[in-house]
Amino acid sequence: MGNIIQAQKGESFFDPACGSGEFISEIIKNQVAISGSEYDVDRLKISKMKMLVNDLSPSNISPSYFTEGHNLKKNFDIILSNPPFSLKIPFDMEMHFCMYGKPPTSNADFAFLQYCIFMLKDNGRAA
């Protein structure tokens, strides 16, 4: 996946469901500014360790649900992620990013896709 996205040095990268950091590990070699979020604390620790092993600060990897803490629109050149399929949307989740209709609360897949689009810069790329 990292090869498909063709990250260039100096671009900004975000994985809103970074898990154990597989995409982060893959994209690190392209010298991009890396950010990520993960709600599972154990997976988050693995992501941060992978960043440390590569001499990068893990400070841009945050412990959060994919929609928390990133309220600015169009922040990133690249979004590469494995969606957290079949998550339920928390009842109180803010939906400011839903440009294409309110997603069902029974499944966060549509919300996740809208969030990724919302977070991309105008000429950004996602996979």
What positions do the PLM features span?
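Short, flexible active-site loops
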Residues: 97-100, 125-127
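Conserved Class I SAM-dependent methyltransferase catalytic core
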Residues: 105-127
